[in-house]
């Protein structure tokens, strides 16, 4: 008698409705699906960690962007780390760990593409490949060194000031510490006194303030106090009032790195732009946006530098973790409420599955 192998079932988070304004848990749906049988050249991955990132909010909208919108009734996507549990591909063996873009689900099948990369679990905790050793770290690195034209080790950096908004977040916290490694004076804005303390005591920056306590309309005056000689580079993760305040305080020929604008992602209608943009003309400012995937040619340089800084203890890395795939929507919503310090992650499965 032939005994049929029991079909593997995977849980996935689907986009049920497109959010208007701030997302709610009702926009998401936990779904059970059958996992297909493997074809030649394919391998099956069980996810262990998944990343939750602000850019995902943009993909929930139905508009043209640099990356396709999420589809209704389909699983969401995002960075993930998992372990191969079945394989019909000689290059990808059972037990190996891989980095992919198929988060928001328990299992996924790949036939290998440029979006899948093997990772070494002995080099660092596997979830770091979603953060400090992944796109998060690379975003901070590219933003400062390439877009912000940050020059290091020239002996004059103590006279130079960098301002980072959302400074205790995943990208912001790395940007702060890279700037300190390069010898710059660093000022950071965050949304709680606990985060102020982390930036000063752990990340080692020079000045941090709670914009909620100061008041968004008073960020400019707070920056005048924190940066009496002006700002050389502003690493913008927030947009809105923070961007306007930074423009007020930039030095002549200052650089503004437009990385993200989390203050605007959930607005149903966009506010007017900065009222002081003419200062970009008179002060000859450079404002440049960027998308990290345009700069993958810097990966080897990034890995070399970041690995060295981590081994030397120069980078402090923090994570906020939600347990269980079913809590991924809660983690996503918490991100926009400022409830994370460092990288927001969801732990889906145990570290060793095979």
Q: Could you tell me what each predicted segment is?
A:
Residues 180-245, 293:
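Adenosine-nucleotide cofactor-binding segment
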Residues 238-315, 348-354:
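Glycine-rich phosphate-binding loop and adjacent beta-alpha segment
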Residues 2-10, 314-321, 329-354:
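C-terminal capping/lid region of NAD(P)-dependent oxidoreductase domains
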Residues 150, 227, 250-251:
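A generic alpha-to-beta junction signature in SAM-dependent methyltransferases
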Residues 106, 191-201, 270-277:
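Short, glycine/polar-rich helix-capping loops at beta-to-alpha or helix-loop-helix junctions
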Residues 137-138, 166-176, 239:
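Glycine-rich NAD(P) Rossmann-fold beta1-alpha1 loop
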Residues 71, 76-83, 91-166:
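NAD(P)H dinucleotide-binding glycine-rich loop of Rossmann-like/cofactor-binding domains
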Residues 34-52, 60-104:
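Glycine-rich beta-strand-centered segment in the early N-terminal region that forms part
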């Amino acid at each position: 008698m032939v005994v049929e192998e029991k079909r593997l079932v995977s849980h996935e988070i689907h986009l049920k409705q497109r959010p208007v304004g701030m997302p709610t848990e009702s926009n998401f749906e936990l779904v059970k699906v059958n996992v297909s049988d493997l074809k030649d050249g394919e391998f099956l991955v069980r996810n262990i960690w998944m990343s939750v990132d602000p850019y995902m909010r943009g993909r929930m909208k139905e508009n043209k962007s640099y990356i396709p919108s999420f589809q209704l009734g389909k699983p969401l996507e995002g960075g993930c780390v998992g372990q191969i549990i079945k394989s019909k591909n000689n290059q990808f063996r059972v037990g190996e760990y891989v980095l992919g873009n198929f988060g928001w689900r328990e299992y996924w099948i790949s036939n290998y593409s440029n979006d899948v990369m093997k990772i070494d679990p002995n080099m660092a905790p596997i979830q770091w490949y979603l953060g400090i050793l992944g796109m998060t770290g690379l975003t901070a690195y590219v933003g400062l060194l390439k877009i912000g034209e940050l020059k290091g080790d020239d002996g004059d950096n103590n006279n130079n000031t960098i301002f980072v908004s959302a400074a205790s977040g995943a990208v912001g916290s790395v940007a702060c510490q890279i700037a300190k490694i390069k010898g710059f004076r660093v000022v950071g804005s965050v949304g709680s006194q606990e985060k102020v303390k982390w930036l000063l005591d752990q990340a080692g920056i020079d000045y941090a303030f709670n914009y909620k306590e100061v008041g968004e309309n008073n960020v400019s005056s707070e920056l005048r106090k924190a940066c009496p000689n002006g700002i050389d580079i502003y690493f913008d993760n927030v947009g809105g009032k923070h961007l306007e305040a930074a423009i007020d305080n930039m030095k002549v020929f200052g650089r503004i790195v437009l990385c993200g604008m989390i203050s605007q992602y959930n607005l149903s209608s966009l506010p007017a732009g900065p009222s002081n943009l003419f200062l970009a003309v008179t002060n000859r400012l450079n404002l440049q946006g960027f998308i990290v995937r345009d700069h993958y040619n810097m990966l080897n340089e990034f890995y070399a530098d970041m690995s060295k800084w981590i081994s030397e203890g120069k980078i402090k890395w923090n994570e906020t973790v939600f347990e269980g795939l079913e809590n991924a929507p809660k983690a996503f919503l918490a991100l926009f409420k400022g409830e994370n310090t460092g990288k927001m992650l969801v732990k889906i499965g145990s570290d060793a599955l095979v």
